Amino acid sequence: MMQFSLHFFKKETRHVEYNLLRAFFEARDDFEVRIHDDRSAEFIYTHPRLLHQAVFYQTKSSQVPNIYRSDAAFLDINIHLEIPILSPDYFTKEVLLIAEQLANKFDFYIYYEIFEDPIEVDIDFIMTIYENLKKAYIDRHPQ
């Protein structure tokens, strides 16, 4: 199944306090934290009632498509979020609220492959993109 992927960037620095990042997720009961090593981890969100999942990844290398198109002031920090494209809109909005909290706490910007440059989190705008992508996916795969 297709994933809706958002990538996190910082402006003019790659510095991230990864111990604080991991603590952000560990403090939440709705996350399972899987640490692979000091440079990679998975933070798996499970909605308490719907049981749908989304995953925040910390990776060793960039997963951003067409990274060289964006403004050089924004630096990829190798953290991204994947939400299954057929997730309920309510669930997706809940995940985006967590992404917004994360971005605000760590001064992150977000990037989706159709953006020219990373942007500050705008949940309504991102939900519109998600809903349009989801509709297009369903139209192409009606079953």
Residue ranges and their predicted role:
Residues 1-143:
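Acidic (Asp/Glu-rich) sequence patches and key acidic residues
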